[in-house]
Amino acid sequence: MAMDMDQRWVNRLPADMLETFHWFRGECFSLIVEDVLRLPSEPYVIVEGFRLLPHLVKPLLAVSSQAIWLLPTPEFRQAMVNSRRSPQWGFVEKTSDPERALGNLLERDAMFTQRLYEEAQRLELKTIEVDSTMTVDELARRVAEALGL
């Protein structure tokens, strides 16, 4: 049975939202791999997305330095949502309590980010924490350094 918008975004705990969100479980990861394998390997291929879970990516790497996870701080994520409050976020407006729905979503995302961090650390994969004080140029420099570019 499908949930209505309040059941999905307002009335559930963010932890329950995280545990039941299928994309955070690697669903469709194999389709991403198929797409990436069709791309030319030169000069470089950068792949991003929350379906790229460290435990799924690591076995595909020749060396662990080929991958890095950019992990937003909760403050960065909030700033991005505030700056992009666009139709993309319109689904929260379809709830009876848009602010709570958005808060739940942000909390779920923060828990997911923490899970990614812990998994990457356990697997000895690189991460960069991204906060709202970091410039695009600084982030690009740090990514290039981490990837040895």
Report the location of each language-model feature:
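Conserved nucleotide-sensing/catalytic segment adjacent to the nucleotide-binding pocket
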Residues: 1-44
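Short glycine-/polar-rich loops that comprise or flank the Walker A/P-loop
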Residues: 61-66, 123-125
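A glycine- and Lys/Arg-enriched "phosphate-lid" helix/loop adjacent to the NTP-binding pocket
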Residues: 64-112
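Conserved catalytic network of the ASCE P-loop NTPase/AAA+ motor domain
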Residues: 36-40, 58-64
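Conserved nucleotide-binding/hydrolysis micro-motifs of P-loop NTPases
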Residues: 51-53, 71-77, 134
